[in-house]
UniProtKB/Swiss-Prot annotation:
Annotated organism of origin: Xenopus tropicalis
Family affiliation: Belongs to the TMEM17 family.
Highest taxon in the source lineage: Eukaryota
Annotated protein name in UniProt: Transmembrane protein 17B
UniProt cross-references to InterPro entries, sorted A to Z: Uncharacterised_TM-17
Role of this protein: Transmembrane component of the tectonic-like complex, a complex localized at the transition zone of primary cilia and acting as a barrier that prevents diffusion of transmembrane proteins between the cilia and plasma membranes. Required for ciliogenesis and sonic hedgehog/SHH signaling.
Transmembrane feature ranges: 51-71, 84-104, 116-136, 147-167
Keyword Transport: no
Subcellular location: Cell projection, Cilium membrane
């Protein structure tokens, strides 16, 4: 059963455009690569990423409990400014993590580019900076328990960034290629002349995203 996405249509469209611009419209490196593309659809979901998300989801409640314990121990020793800053950081991390893991699960398992792109953006722009702040700022009075759970969490984050980037790159190009080939087959079936150079995906100088927009990445 397909899971519902929490992302609005406009957000999904924007994320699809970002993914297309990053992984399809690169005319320097991508166009020079030689690949044996096939028209059939391959399974693009990543088992390592799904395993990371699964174990991350189980680990995160222990991370929250550990942070509550350490906050209770050191809260009175923090300055008023850092009490607010630390509390806000933990609340944001907790709220964003629930959304991040869900859209990462949906994006990877159901091969949805916008959700996977949103997962990567949330990881890079929110979770990773906040976690590094908690881990490196000595004025937070880092305790051994803090250090242990933060390091484990950081390993999850780093692995998910690398794997999701590679999966998103492969997924975006594959879907764009399938969409492009589908449109080419429609033109051929209607006896519309198709420029032979356009049928060679790796040598085309006009990006697929510019020709067809981000429709291929929305589903």
């Amino acid at each position: 059963m397909a899971l519902l996405t929490p992302l609005p249509g406009s957000v999904r469209h924007g994320l699809a455009r970002i993914s297309g611009s990053l992984f399809i419209q690169n005319k320097t490196r991508d166009c020079g690569e030689q690949h044996a593309y096939q028209s059939g659809h391959d399974l693009l979901s990543s088992l390592p990423l799904q395993m990371m998300l699964y174990f991350n989801a189980f680990f995160f409640p222990f991370w929250i409990i550990s942070e509550i314990i350490t906050m209770e121990l050191k809260f009175g020793r923090l300055s008023g400014y850092y009490q607010i800053l630390l509390t806000t950081s933990l609340v944001i991390l907790t709220l964003v993590e629930s959304l991040r893991l869900y859209i990462g699960y949906v994006g990877n398992l159901h091969e949805k580019v916008p959700e996977l792109a949103g997962f990567l953006i949330l990881t890079l722009l929110i979770q990773l900076p906040l976690l590094l702040f908690l881990l490196t700022d000595n004025r937070n009075l880092l305790l051994p328990l803090d250090l242990a759970v933060h390091m484990i969490y950081l390993m999850f984050i780093n692995a998910e960034i690398v794997i999701s980037f590679l999966v998103l790159k492969t997924m975006t190009r594959q879907f764009a290629l399938e969409y492009y080939l589908q449109q080419s087959e429609i033109l051929v079936s209607k006896h519309v002349p198709v420029n032979r150079t356009l049928l060679r995906f790796q040598n085309t100088t006009t990006s697929i995203a510019e020709q067809y927009g981000s429709d291929a990445l929305m589903y």
